Amino acid sequence: MLHAYDGGVPFHLYLKEQFKEHKNWGSKDRKRYRACCYFFWRNAIGVSRNNAEDILQWLQSHYTSDTSISETPSITHPYHSVIHNISTSIDHQTLQDWFKEEPPVWLRATNGKTKAVLQQLQKLNTPILHQSNDVVAVPAQANLNPITDFGYAYIQDIGSQMAMDWRELPLQHMCNPNHAIWDCCCGAGGKAITLLQNHPKANVTCSDVRANILENLQKRFQLLQLSKPKTQVIDLQNTVGSSNQYDVVMADVPCSGSGTWRRNPENIHFFSPLEINMYANRQLNIIQNAQHSVKLGGYLVYMTCSVFRAENEAIIEQFIEKHAGFEKIEDKYCGGNQNHGDYIYRAVLQRVR
């Protein structure tokens, strides 16, 4: 499986298809094969996958079914090919430790359904790894369909939830019906959902370049019993935002995803450093088009799930250099190793003139 995989789809989906094809593999076999594969992705950095023999030899030397006593290589940093691109705010050893651990899945209960979520987890014999109010972390392989399919909770990493915690920011006062917020790269709507969980009366518009994504977004909001946002299909790569329309513009831009790679560790084996500049150019273009829509005194919130400076701090520096009317209020990395989550970069800018 490791030799044949080409990176075309997420490995967990590829693995699922392999298990379907090999119905003779029992549950213990599937669990063992999965653990072995992900041990390889997390630790075999730089190991050739040109032939199956190289992979097998490496696994025989380093892996046992008890990963607690497996000899984990520590010479090669998982991000070694892009190490000089990592933000100076992120410690390299901390990032390595973070990458080698399988992350939990984070759930957030909706509309006061925390008790129902906890009862369902108990019924499913699912251990709770972390809990804070309506946010719960469970093991990665937990079956959460009985919870998420009925809208009791939604899945969102704690890093993203922390990035949407605006309680200490001045823009929290704009999360009401009298102010307009635009989630201009909304994707499946996760950030907008959390915004409305935190501020139920917020006036939100969501846009994306993909119409089908917006249709799915509306279904998610309906399932979670949240007020549906206004939606628009907009390609901000090629379209300038309308002038002075929004008090807050939220840009969770497409990125390398390097701050989430421990969830999909295979990605690091297929990533080219040349992609960083490609993403950075796209990101700068998007926020330069979106900034036209920020009212005077309003805010631009820039977010990525990347650990690379070129996609984060450098973008903000370039943007402010070109657009002197904006000032940086703050920038930070949310989540990360300390919080058992993804690394989410968030910068808050204000249009002051």
Q: What is each model feature region?
A:
Residues 1-353:
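S-adenosylmethionine
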